């Protein structure tokens, strides 16, 4: 793909990057809403519920720099696609098969790992696709 085509599609690419981030962040928000049901269905106590919330954030924050380096080494697009696949697959499998709070905590940690792949990949793709004079606007959106 030549530079002119990439430049012409930069706003579409920004939309896809934004959607990718929304997908990963919605995983965190939706769990908040589901906590009462998780407590009832899994018999989780307050400590386990807290870990269900925090496992994602702790792994995401701890692995963000490492996964950014992985994306630099193996490619931005593969990192983005792998991260989205991990988040989506683990979400689907957890919803279908999780029977204990420990399963959900482990799954949330894996989702945090996938999200840690997505975040730096989206930002690095935006930096490559947008010219310097438009990068601030693109990152702000």
Task: Name each model feature, range by range.
Residues 2-141:
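Transmembrane-helix bundle of Major Facilitator Superfamily
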